[in-house]
Amino acid sequence: MVDNSKIRVVVGMSGGVDSSVSALLLKQQGYDVVGVFMKNWDDTNDDGVCTATEDYEDVKKVADKIGIPYYSINFEKEYWERVFQYFLKEYKAGRTPNPDIMCNTEVKFKSFLEYALDLDADYLAMGHYAKTMVDENGVTHMMRPKDGNKDQTYFLSQLTQEQIKRVMFPLQDLTKPEVRRIAEEAGLVNAKKKDSTGICFIGERNFKHFLSEFLPAQGGDMVTPDGKVVGHHAGLMYYTIGQRQGLGLGSTKESTAPWFVVGKDLEKNQLIVEQGYDSPRLYADRLQASGMTFFTGNPEEDTEFKATAKFRYRQCDVGVTVKYHAASKTADVYFDEPARAVTPGQALVLYNGEECLGGGNIDAAFKDDKKLQLV
Ligand SMILES: Nc1ncnc2c1ncn2[C@@H]1O[C@H](COP(=O)(O)OP(=O)(O)OP(=O)(O)O)[C@@H](O)[C@H]1O
Protein backbone atom coordinates (compact mmCIF):
# COMPACT_ATOMS: atom_id res chain seq x y z
CA MET A 1 0.00 0.00 0.00
CA VAL A 2 1.27 3.51 -0.85
CA ASP A 3 2.42 5.62 2.06
CA ASN A 4 0.47 8.88 1.97
CA SER A 5 1.38 9.92 5.47
CA LYS A 6 3.85 12.58 4.30
CA ILE A 7 1.27 14.20 2.02
CA ARG A 8 -0.63 16.91 3.82
CA VAL A 9 -4.15 17.64 2.60
CA VAL A 10 -6.25 20.51 3.88
CA VAL A 11 -9.95 19.71 3.49
CA GLY A 12 -12.46 22.53 3.17
CA MET A 13 -15.07 21.40 5.69
CA SER A 14 -18.46 23.11 5.57
CA GLY A 15 -20.16 20.98 8.19
CA GLY A 16 -22.02 19.19 5.39
CA VAL A 17 -21.94 15.52 4.53
CA ASP A 18 -19.94 15.85 1.30
CA SER A 19 -16.87 17.50 2.78
CA SER A 20 -17.07 15.31 5.89
CA VAL A 21 -16.94 12.13 3.82
CA SER A 22 -14.12 13.66 1.76
CA ALA A 23 -12.09 14.13 4.93
CA LEU A 24 -12.95 10.62 6.13
CA LEU A 25 -11.86 8.98 2.87
CA LEU A 26 -8.55 10.85 2.81
CA LYS A 27 -7.87 9.89 6.41
CA GLN A 28 -8.63 6.24 5.57
CA GLN A 29 -6.17 6.51 2.68
CA GLY A 30 -3.49 7.51 5.17
CA TYR A 31 -3.02 11.19 4.27
CA ASP A 32 -2.01 13.81 6.82
CA VAL A 33 -5.47 15.46 6.89
CA VAL A 34 -6.33 18.87 8.37
CA GLY A 35 -9.91 20.16 8.35
CA VAL A 36 -10.54 23.87 7.88
CA PHE A 37 -13.86 25.69 8.16
CA MET A 38 -14.20 28.98 6.34
CA LYS A 39 -16.48 31.76 7.52
CA ASN A 40 -17.45 33.94 4.57
CA TRP A 41 -20.62 35.61 5.68
CA ASP A 42 -22.15 36.84 8.90
CA ASP A 43 -25.36 34.91 8.45
CA THR A 44 -27.31 35.40 11.62
CA ASN A 45 -30.87 34.56 10.59
CA ASP A 46 -34.12 36.28 11.54
CA ASP A 47 -34.23 34.33 14.83
CA GLY A 48 -30.74 35.51 15.78
CA VAL A 49 -29.18 32.10 15.07
CA CYS A 50 -25.88 32.11 13.23
CA THR A 51 -25.91 29.07 10.92
CA ALA A 52 -22.11 29.30 10.49
CA THR A 53 -21.72 28.62 14.21
CA GLU A 54 -23.93 25.54 13.93
CA ASP A 55 -21.99 24.36 10.88
CA TYR A 56 -18.68 24.78 12.68
CA GLU A 57 -20.05 22.67 15.55
CA ASP A 58 -20.68 19.89 13.02
CA VAL A 59 -17.14 20.28 11.65
CA LYS A 60 -15.74 19.84 15.18
CA LYS A 61 -17.82 16.73 15.85
CA VAL A 62 -16.90 15.11 12.54
CA ALA A 63 -13.20 16.01 12.83
CA ASP A 64 -13.09 14.54 16.36
CA LYS A 65 -14.82 11.37 15.16
CA ILE A 66 -12.40 10.95 12.25
CA GLY A 67 -9.44 11.97 14.39
CA ILE A 68 -8.08 14.99 12.51
CA PRO A 69 -7.11 18.49 13.68
CA TYR A 70 -9.32 21.38 12.58
CA TYR A 71 -9.22 25.16 12.32
CA SER A 72 -11.50 27.97 11.35
CA ILE A 73 -10.55 30.89 9.11
CA ASN A 74 -12.42 34.10 8.42
CA PHE A 75 -12.70 35.32 4.83
CA GLU A 76 -15.64 37.66 5.28
CA LYS A 77 -13.67 40.65 4.01
CA GLU A 78 -12.43 38.87 0.87
CA TYR A 79 -15.89 37.48 0.22
CA TRP A 80 -17.54 40.87 0.68
CA GLU A 81 -15.09 42.66 -1.60
CA ARG A 82 -14.61 40.13 -4.36
CA VAL A 83 -17.84 38.16 -4.50
CA PHE A 84 -20.61 40.24 -3.00
CA GLN A 85 -19.63 43.56 -4.63
CA TYR A 86 -19.49 41.80 -8.01
CA PHE A 87 -22.90 40.26 -7.31
CA LEU A 88 -24.42 43.70 -6.59
CA LYS A 89 -22.72 45.37 -9.56
CA GLU A 90 -24.09 42.74 -11.93
CA TYR A 91 -27.63 43.08 -10.61
CA LYS A 92 -27.38 46.85 -10.91
CA ALA A 93 -26.42 46.38 -14.56
CA GLY A 94 -29.54 44.27 -15.14
CA ARG A 95 -27.63 41.02 -15.46
CA THR A 96 -28.08 37.72 -13.61
CA PRO A 97 -24.75 36.91 -11.94
CA ASN A 98 -23.39 33.65 -10.66
CA PRO A 99 -21.78 34.29 -7.27
CA ASP A 100 -20.91 30.61 -6.73
CA ILE A 101 -18.47 30.72 -9.65
CA MET A 102 -16.89 33.90 -8.30
CA CYS A 103 -16.69 32.36 -4.83
CA ASN A 104 -14.75 29.43 -6.27
CA THR A 105 -12.30 31.49 -8.33
CA GLU A 106 -11.77 34.26 -5.77
CA VAL A 107 -12.20 32.70 -2.35
CA LYS A 108 -12.31 28.90 -2.15
CA PHE A 109 -9.58 28.26 -4.71
CA LYS A 110 -7.65 31.50 -4.17
CA SER A 111 -7.51 32.89 -0.62
CA PHE A 112 -8.39 29.55 0.89
CA LEU A 113 -5.94 27.65 -1.32
CA GLU A 114 -3.18 30.13 -0.37
CA TYR A 115 -4.06 29.63 3.28
CA ALA A 116 -3.84 25.85 2.86
CA LEU A 117 -0.46 26.11 1.18
CA ASP A 118 0.70 28.30 4.08
CA LEU A 119 -0.24 25.40 6.36
CA ASP A 120 2.30 23.39 4.37
CA ALA A 121 -0.41 21.49 2.54
CA ASP A 122 0.45 19.65 -0.65
CA TYR A 123 -3.20 19.67 -1.72
CA LEU A 124 -6.51 21.28 -0.96
CA ALA A 125 -9.44 18.84 -0.99
CA MET A 126 -13.08 19.81 -1.48
CA GLY A 127 -16.35 17.93 -1.36
CA HIS A 128 -17.43 19.13 -4.80
CA TYR A 129 -18.71 16.57 -7.28
CA ALA A 130 -16.02 16.95 -9.92
CA LYS A 131 -13.05 14.96 -11.06
CA THR A 132 -9.47 15.72 -12.05
CA MET A 133 -7.14 13.62 -14.15
CA VAL A 134 -3.43 14.14 -14.79
CA ASP A 135 -2.20 13.26 -18.30
CA GLU A 136 1.20 11.86 -19.29
CA ASN A 137 2.60 15.41 -19.61
CA GLY A 138 1.63 16.27 -16.05
CA VAL A 139 -1.26 18.51 -17.14
CA THR A 140 -4.40 18.34 -15.00
CA HIS A 141 -7.76 18.01 -16.75
CA MET A 142 -11.20 18.68 -15.28
CA MET A 143 -13.66 15.83 -15.85
CA ARG A 144 -17.31 15.19 -15.15
CA PRO A 145 -17.72 13.18 -11.90
CA LYS A 146 -19.44 9.80 -11.58
CA ASP A 147 -22.63 11.38 -10.22
CA GLY A 148 -23.91 13.27 -13.26
CA ASN A 149 -26.89 14.51 -11.30
CA LYS A 150 -24.66 16.34 -8.79
CA ASP A 151 -22.00 17.43 -11.33
CA GLN A 152 -20.54 20.77 -10.09
CA THR A 153 -18.05 21.35 -12.91
CA TYR A 154 -20.27 24.25 -14.05
CA PHE A 155 -19.33 26.19 -10.90
CA LEU A 156 -15.65 25.30 -11.18
CA SER A 157 -15.38 26.21 -14.86
CA GLN A 158 -13.33 29.39 -14.43
CA LEU A 159 -10.47 27.89 -12.43
CA THR A 160 -6.98 27.78 -13.91
CA GLN A 161 -4.39 25.02 -14.26
CA GLU A 162 -2.45 26.54 -11.34
CA GLN A 163 -5.50 26.17 -9.14
CA ILE A 164 -6.74 22.71 -10.14
CA LYS A 165 -3.36 21.03 -10.02
CA ARG A 166 -3.35 21.57 -6.25
CA VAL A 167 -6.87 20.26 -5.73
CA MET A 168 -8.36 16.85 -4.88
CA PHE A 169 -12.01 15.89 -5.19
CA PRO A 170 -12.34 12.69 -3.11
CA LEU A 171 -15.99 12.21 -4.16
CA GLN A 172 -15.18 12.07 -7.86
CA ASP A 173 -16.06 8.40 -8.25
CA LEU A 174 -19.01 8.29 -5.83
CA THR A 175 -22.69 9.09 -6.09
CA LYS A 176 -24.50 11.13 -3.47
CA PRO A 177 -26.41 8.07 -2.11
CA GLU A 178 -23.08 6.27 -1.75
CA VAL A 179 -21.64 9.27 0.11
CA ARG A 180 -24.57 9.31 2.54
CA ARG A 181 -24.20 5.58 3.12
CA ILE A 182 -20.48 5.98 3.92
CA ALA A 183 -21.32 8.78 6.36
CA GLU A 184 -23.98 6.68 8.05
CA GLU A 185 -21.76 3.62 8.36
CA ALA A 186 -19.00 5.77 9.87
CA GLY A 187 -21.49 7.28 12.34
CA LEU A 188 -20.97 10.89 11.24
CA VAL A 189 -23.45 13.24 12.91
CA ASN A 190 -24.37 14.96 9.64
CA ALA A 191 -25.05 11.79 7.58
CA LYS A 192 -28.64 12.92 7.08
CA LYS A 193 -28.05 16.69 7.03
CA LYS A 194 -30.01 18.53 4.35
CA ASP A 195 -28.10 19.68 1.24
CA SER A 196 -27.50 23.42 1.06
CA THR A 197 -29.59 25.10 -1.63
CA GLY A 198 -29.53 28.38 -3.50
CA ILE A 199 -27.02 31.19 -3.15
CA CYS A 200 -25.06 30.55 0.02
CA PHE A 201 -25.38 34.00 1.59
CA ILE A 202 -29.10 34.22 0.94
CA GLY A 203 -29.93 30.72 2.15
CA GLU A 204 -33.63 30.20 2.69
CA ARG A 205 -34.38 33.93 2.86
CA ASN A 206 -36.64 35.73 0.42
CA PHE A 207 -34.48 36.82 -2.49
CA LYS A 208 -36.34 40.05 -3.30
CA HIS A 209 -36.26 41.19 0.27
CA PHE A 210 -32.58 40.36 0.62
CA LEU A 211 -31.59 42.26 -2.52
CA SER A 212 -33.70 45.29 -1.62
CA GLU A 213 -31.65 45.72 1.54
CA PHE A 214 -28.56 46.37 -0.59
CA LEU A 215 -29.81 47.89 -3.83
CA PRO A 216 -32.50 50.56 -4.14
CA ALA A 217 -35.22 49.22 -6.39
CA GLN A 218 -36.79 51.45 -8.99
CA GLY A 219 -40.18 50.30 -10.19
CA GLY A 220 -41.36 50.85 -13.76
CA ASP A 221 -43.59 49.62 -16.54
CA MET A 222 -44.03 46.13 -17.85
CA VAL A 223 -44.54 46.46 -21.57
CA THR A 224 -45.20 44.18 -24.51
CA PRO A 225 -42.58 44.13 -27.28
CA ASP A 226 -44.69 46.65 -29.23
CA GLY A 227 -44.73 49.04 -26.28
CA LYS A 228 -48.17 48.45 -24.73
CA VAL A 229 -48.07 48.90 -20.95
CA VAL A 230 -49.55 45.80 -19.27
CA GLY A 231 -48.36 46.09 -15.69
CA HIS A 232 -45.88 47.40 -13.18
CA HIS A 233 -42.55 45.89 -12.15
CA ALA A 234 -40.86 46.37 -8.78
CA GLY A 235 -37.33 46.83 -10.17
CA LEU A 236 -35.60 45.26 -13.21
CA MET A 237 -33.05 43.47 -11.03
CA TYR A 238 -35.73 41.20 -9.61
CA TYR A 239 -36.43 39.55 -12.95
CA THR A 240 -34.47 37.22 -15.13
CA ILE A 241 -34.79 36.39 -18.81
CA GLY A 242 -37.31 33.63 -19.49
CA GLN A 243 -38.90 33.97 -16.03
CA ARG A 244 -42.59 33.17 -15.64
CA GLN A 245 -43.23 33.33 -11.89
CA GLY A 246 -44.13 36.51 -10.08
CA LEU A 247 -45.28 38.68 -12.97
CA GLY A 248 -48.86 38.87 -11.74
CA LEU A 249 -50.31 39.16 -15.23
CA GLY A 250 -53.46 37.30 -16.28
CA SER A 251 -55.04 36.17 -19.52
CA THR A 252 -55.89 38.66 -22.23
CA LYS A 253 -58.68 38.75 -24.82
CA GLU A 254 -56.19 37.41 -27.36
CA SER A 255 -54.65 34.60 -25.33
CA THR A 256 -54.79 32.58 -22.11
CA ALA A 257 -51.07 31.70 -22.34
CA PRO A 258 -48.85 32.65 -19.37
CA TRP A 259 -46.53 35.67 -19.53
CA PHE A 260 -42.74 35.48 -19.65
CA VAL A 261 -39.93 38.01 -19.36
CA VAL A 262 -38.42 38.35 -22.84
CA GLY A 263 -36.22 41.43 -22.38
CA LYS A 264 -35.15 44.42 -20.32
CA ASP A 265 -34.74 48.02 -21.44
CA LEU A 266 -32.41 49.53 -18.87
CA GLU A 267 -32.60 53.05 -20.27
CA LYS A 268 -36.36 53.22 -20.11
CA ASN A 269 -36.49 51.03 -17.00
CA GLN A 270 -38.99 48.78 -18.77
CA LEU A 271 -39.48 45.06 -18.38
CA ILE A 272 -40.48 43.52 -21.69
CA VAL A 273 -42.99 40.69 -21.35
CA GLU A 274 -44.85 38.48 -23.75
CA GLN A 275 -47.36 35.65 -23.65
CA GLY A 276 -46.21 32.11 -24.47
CA TYR A 277 -43.20 30.01 -23.48
CA ASP A 278 -41.84 29.91 -26.99
CA SER A 279 -41.45 33.58 -27.82
CA PRO A 280 -38.95 33.87 -30.70
CA ARG A 281 -37.44 36.80 -28.76
CA LEU A 282 -36.04 34.32 -26.26
CA TYR A 283 -34.19 32.22 -28.81
CA ALA A 284 -30.57 32.94 -29.69
CA ASP A 285 -28.29 31.24 -32.19
CA ARG A 286 -25.03 32.78 -30.95
CA LEU A 287 -23.53 34.29 -27.84
CA GLN A 288 -20.52 36.35 -26.98
CA ALA A 289 -18.50 35.52 -23.90
CA SER A 290 -15.56 37.22 -22.21
CA GLY A 291 -13.03 36.23 -19.56
CA MET A 292 -12.56 32.84 -21.20
CA THR A 293 -10.47 30.43 -19.13
CA PHE A 294 -9.36 26.95 -20.18
CA PHE A 295 -8.23 24.46 -17.55
CA THR A 296 -5.26 23.30 -19.61
CA GLY A 297 -4.22 26.89 -20.42
CA ASN A 298 -5.69 29.41 -22.87
CA PRO A 299 -4.79 28.85 -26.54
CA GLU A 300 -2.20 31.41 -27.67
CA GLU A 301 -3.76 31.79 -31.10
CA ASP A 302 -7.27 32.22 -32.42
CA THR A 303 -8.92 28.81 -32.70
CA GLU A 304 -12.17 27.29 -33.86
CA PHE A 305 -13.50 24.00 -32.53
CA LYS A 306 -16.64 21.94 -31.90
CA ALA A 307 -17.77 21.35 -28.33
CA THR A 308 -20.89 21.01 -26.22
CA ALA A 309 -21.97 23.81 -23.90
CA LYS A 310 -24.12 24.73 -20.94
CA PHE A 311 -25.43 28.28 -20.53
CA ARG A 312 -26.95 27.65 -17.13
CA TYR A 313 -26.40 25.07 -14.38
CA ARG A 314 -29.27 22.62 -14.81
CA GLN A 315 -29.32 22.27 -18.55
CA CYS A 316 -28.52 19.51 -21.03
CA ASP A 317 -25.45 20.16 -23.16
CA VAL A 318 -26.03 21.65 -26.60
CA GLY A 319 -23.75 21.28 -29.60
CA VAL A 320 -21.76 24.42 -30.46
CA THR A 321 -18.93 25.76 -32.60
CA VAL A 322 -16.55 27.99 -30.66
CA LYS A 323 -14.49 30.76 -32.24
CA TYR A 324 -11.96 31.78 -29.62
CA HIS A 325 -10.17 35.14 -29.92
CA ALA A 326 -6.85 34.82 -28.13
CA ALA A 327 -5.91 38.51 -27.77
CA SER A 328 -9.13 39.49 -25.98
CA LYS A 329 -9.86 36.10 -24.34
CA THR A 330 -13.36 36.33 -25.78
CA ALA A 331 -15.38 33.81 -27.76
CA ASP A 332 -18.21 33.75 -30.25
CA VAL A 333 -20.22 30.59 -29.71
CA TYR A 334 -22.54 29.39 -32.49
CA PHE A 335 -25.29 26.97 -31.48
CA ASP A 336 -26.21 23.91 -33.55
CA GLU A 337 -29.83 24.73 -32.69
CA PRO A 338 -31.41 27.92 -31.29
CA ALA A 339 -31.29 28.01 -27.47
CA ARG A 340 -33.88 29.58 -25.14
CA ALA A 341 -33.18 32.26 -22.52
CA VAL A 342 -29.42 32.57 -22.85
CA THR A 343 -28.87 35.07 -20.03
CA PRO A 344 -26.13 37.71 -19.79
CA GLY A 345 -24.17 37.39 -16.56
CA GLN A 346 -24.51 33.61 -16.43
CA ALA A 347 -21.60 31.35 -17.26
CA LEU A 348 -20.84 29.62 -20.52
CA VAL A 349 -19.23 26.25 -19.84
CA LEU A 350 -17.67 24.09 -22.56
CA TYR A 351 -17.26 20.31 -22.64
CA ASN A 352 -15.63 17.76 -24.90
CA GLY A 353 -17.29 14.46 -23.98
CA GLU A 354 -16.42 13.76 -20.35
CA GLU A 355 -13.93 16.61 -20.14
CA CYS A 356 -14.86 20.10 -18.97
CA LEU A 357 -12.73 22.47 -21.04
CA GLY A 358 -13.42 25.73 -19.22
CA GLY A 359 -15.68 28.70 -19.77
CA GLY A 360 -16.39 32.40 -19.52
CA ASN A 361 -19.13 34.93 -18.85
CA ILE A 362 -22.02 35.48 -21.22
CA ASP A 363 -22.09 39.13 -22.34
CA ALA A 364 -24.69 39.09 -25.10
CA ALA A 365 -26.88 36.78 -27.18
CA PHE A 366 -27.79 37.16 -30.86
CA LYS A 367 -30.35 35.90 -33.37
CA ASP A 368 -29.53 36.26 -37.07
CA ASP A 369 -26.71 38.62 -36.06
CA LYS A 370 -29.13 40.91 -34.25
CA LYS A 371 -28.39 41.43 -30.55
CA LEU A 372 -31.27 40.40 -28.29
CA GLN A 373 -32.37 43.14 -25.93
CA LEU A 374 -31.80 41.17 -22.75
CA VAL A 375 -30.18 43.91 -20.63
N1 LIG B 1 -17.77 27.17 4.98
C1 LIG B 1 -16.95 26.34 4.34
N2 LIG B 1 -15.73 26.06 4.86
C2 LIG B 1 -14.87 25.22 4.24
N3 LIG B 1 -15.14 24.62 3.08
C3 LIG B 1 -16.34 24.85 2.52
C4 LIG B 1 -17.30 25.72 3.10
N4 LIG B 1 -18.40 25.76 2.31
C5 LIG B 1 -18.14 24.93 1.27
N5 LIG B 1 -16.90 24.38 1.39
C6 LIG B 1 -16.26 23.40 0.48
O1 LIG B 1 -16.82 23.52 -0.83
C7 LIG B 1 -17.46 22.30 -1.19
C8 LIG B 1 -18.68 22.58 -2.06
O2 LIG B 1 -19.50 23.49 -1.40
P1 LIG B 1 -21.09 23.46 -1.56
O3 LIG B 1 -21.59 24.69 -0.93
O4 LIG B 1 -21.40 23.16 -2.96
O5 LIG B 1 -21.40 22.29 -0.58
P2 LIG B 1 -22.14 20.93 -0.65
O6 LIG B 1 -22.05 20.27 -1.98
O7 LIG B 1 -23.46 21.12 -0.01
O8 LIG B 1 -21.11 20.14 0.29
P3 LIG B 1 -21.19 19.86 1.84
O9 LIG B 1 -22.15 18.69 1.95
O10 LIG B 1 -19.78 19.50 2.20
O11 LIG B 1 -21.68 21.14 2.49
C9 LIG B 1 -17.78 21.64 0.14
O12 LIG B 1 -17.96 20.24 0.00
C10 LIG B 1 -16.56 22.00 0.95
O13 LIG B 1 -15.45 21.19 0.66
From Swiss-Prot:
One GO MF term: ATP binding
The entry's keywords: ATP-binding, Cytoplasm, Disulfide bond, Nucleotide-binding, RNA-binding, Transferase, tRNA processing, tRNA-binding
Location relative to the cell: Cytoplasm
Annotated spans, Interaction with target base in tRNA: 98-100
Alphabetized Pfam families for the sequence: tRNA_Me_trans, tRNA_Me_trans_C, tRNA_Me_trans_M
tRNA processing found in the keyword field: yes
Top EC group: transferase
Bridged cysteine pairs (disulfide): C103-C200
Domain of life from the UniProt record: Bacteria
Family: Belongs to the MnmA/TRMU family.
Protein name stated in the entry: tRNA-specific 2-thiouridylase MnmA
